[in-house]
């Protein structure tokens, strides 16, 4: 029994120093790393399209914020409790429809393009000033539209112009 414990302790003693190493690099599950992503005009276009897609996914939510609150839609017995709260003017945090996450995801995508598109232009010779300015114009407009809806629905909201720095 003592020799078995000795063997286990020796094996553990040999394994512990190799368990932690400086060469260990964690890669995000999505497989994309910020330093490797912003390399071409296609990367810029992908983020711009992602911002549009995220905004388009909010269509039902934007409808509810406008039409239900304006009394333009009549509920029925199948109307959810959160819809009823919006109709009553309850746009507080206890209502699951009143979530800023999608708006700020769009804003973050736009901020990423605003920050990184000029850097991509330096490394991608096919990325022209014309194309870059077109993408920048789109994301400035889209970010402004997101803030327009946020302010219209919720009033004062945080104004963020820098992208998040996480992978």
Residue ranges and their predicted role:
Residues 45, 53, 81-154:
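Conserved, well-structured interaction surfaces
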Residues 29-33, 89-91, 126-129, 161-167:
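Short linear capping/connector segments at secondary-structure termini
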Residues 20-27, 79-83, 157:
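Short, compositionally biased low-complexity segments
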Residues 69, 75-85, 90-91, 162:
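A structural signal for short, hydrophobic/glycine-enriched beta-strand patches
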Residues 20-67, 92:
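Membrane-proximal, proline-rich intrinsically disordered regions
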Residues 152-162:
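Short, well-structured active-site flanking segments
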Residues 1-29:
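Bacterial Sec-dependent N-terminal signal peptides
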């Amino acid at each position: 029994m003592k020799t078995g414990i000795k063997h286990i302790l020796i094996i553990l003693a040999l394994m512990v120093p190799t368990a932690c190493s400086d060469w260990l690099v964690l890669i995000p599950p999505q497989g994309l790393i910020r330093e490797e992503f912003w390399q071409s005009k296609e990367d810029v276009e992908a983020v711009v399209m992602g911002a549009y897609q995220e905004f388009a996914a909010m269509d039902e939510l934007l409808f509810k914020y406008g039409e239900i609150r304006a009394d333009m839609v009549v509920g029925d017995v199948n109307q959810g409790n959160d819809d009823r709260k919006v109709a009553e003017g309850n746009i507080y945090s206890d209502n699951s429809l009143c979530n800023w996450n999608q708006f700020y995801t769009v804003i973050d995508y736009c901020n990423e393009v605003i920050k990184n598109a000029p850097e991509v232009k330096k490394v991608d010779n096919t990325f022209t000033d014309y194309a870059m300015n077109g993408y920048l114009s789109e994301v400035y407009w889209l970010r402004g539209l997101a803030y327009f809806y946020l302010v219209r629905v919720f009033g004062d909201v945080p104004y963020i112009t820098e992208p998040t720095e996480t992978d």
